[in-house]
Amino acid sequence: MHSINKLLSGALGLALGCALPALHAEEKTLRLYNWADYFAEDTLARFTAETGIKVIYDVMDGSETLEAKMLAGGSGYDLIFPGDTVAERLMRAGSLQPLDRSKLTALDDIEPGLQKLRTHYEFSRQATVPYTWGTIGLTYNAEQIKQRLPDAPVNSLDMLFKPELAAKFADCGISMIDSPDEVLAVVLNYLGREPRSAKPEDLAAASELLLKLRPYIRKFQSQPVTDLVNGNLCLSLGYSGDMTQAQRTADSAGKNTLFQYRIPREGTTVWMDTMAIPVDAKHPEYAYAFINFVMRPQNMAAISNFTGYPTSNAKARASVDETMRNNPDIYLDEATYARLIPGKDIPQPDMRARMRTWTKFKTATAK
C-alpha cells in the first residue's frame, strides 16, 4: 500500500483556528488510519458535509506498522482498520475499546456468513465492526488460459499446484501473493493438512510442492493488477478484488480482455478488514459517527464498487455493481462459506518456522 497522507481540512481554516483561539471553538476532527484508496472517492467529503467533522486520513503501509503503533500507545488515532487476526491480538493486549453496541446502528445487517466466521475471533468480535472482506483465489486472463489449455481446471488449485499444468502458463506469466501465511495455509489445506500448522512434516510437504512450482513463478506481489492488465501475467494467486480492479482498468483502457476469478473447490483462506477504536482514542464519539455513516447500505455499496471488495452489509448488496453482486465467487453461498479457512493468530515460534519455509521457496532459483 502507498504511504501518503490525505488531510481533508482546509489549511486556511486551521491557520485561523490557531491564530484566533478566542473566536473559534475547537474544530471537530476525526483521525483515522487505513489502507490507501480504501473508501469511495467521496466518502470522506460527504461525511464531513453531513456531520461537520473533519477527517485526517493517514495511510498505513502495512499491518505490522499499525500493530506497532497500537501496542506502543499514544497514536492519536480515533479509528483504525486492522485485519481480523491483528485485531484479535490488539484486543487481547488491551489496545482496543470494547464497542458499545447501543451506539451502533447496523450490526444486525452484517452478512450472515461473516457473522458465523466472526465466531472464530474470541476477543476482537467485541471490539470490531467488519468493513470489507475477501478470499484468496485464482485470477486469470480467460483467453490466454484457454489458448494454452482449453480444459484447464479453473476452479481447482490443480491449475497452479500441479507442476505439469503450471508449466503450460509459465510463458504468459504466473504470480503469487507475497504472503507466507496465506499461501502456506492454502497449500497445506490443498495437501489435506492443518492450514496453520508448523509441524516439521507438514512444512516439509508444503516445501516440496512449492519448490516444484518455483521455476514457473514469475513474480511475488500483492498488487498484480497492472501486470495483469498489461499482459505480463495471465494467472495470479491473490486477493479476490484483483479481478474486479483488473477488469475495470482494462475496460477503461479500451482493452478487450476478460478476467475471471475462482475460489478453488479445495478451499481457501478468508480475511476481514475491520473498524476498531483504540483504547486511548480522544474522540470515540466521532469514530462511532463514522462507523454508522460508512455502514449505511448506500455508502457501503459505493465503497464496494470502488474498491472491488464485497461489502459486509447485507442490505448494501442490492446496490453493488451487478458484475460483482452476481458473481458466486465474490458474494458466496453457504456451501462456499463452509470451505473458507478463517484467520488464526499463530505463535511466534510457529510463524518463524513458516517464514523459513517461505523464504526457502522464494529464494530458490527460478528458470
Describe every region a protein language model picked out:
Residues 203-211, 255-276:
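Periplasmic-binding protein-like
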Residues 334-367:
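Conserved C-terminal helix/tail region of periplasmic/extracytoplasmic solute-binding proteins
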Residues 273, 278-339, 343:
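Mature extracytoplasmic/periplasmic domains
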Residues 87-218, 223-225, 229:
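Extracytoplasmic ligand-binding site segments that recognize negatively charged/polar headgroups
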Residues 26-90:
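Early extracytoplasmic/lumenal segment of secretory-pathway proteins
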Residues 9-19:
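Bacterial N-terminal signal peptides
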Residues 78-82, 217-218, 234-239:
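Paired acidic/hydrophobic, glycine-rich loop segments that form the ligand-binding mouth/hinge
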Residues 86-89, 235-255:
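A ligand-binding cleft/hinge motif common to bilobed small-molecule-binding domains
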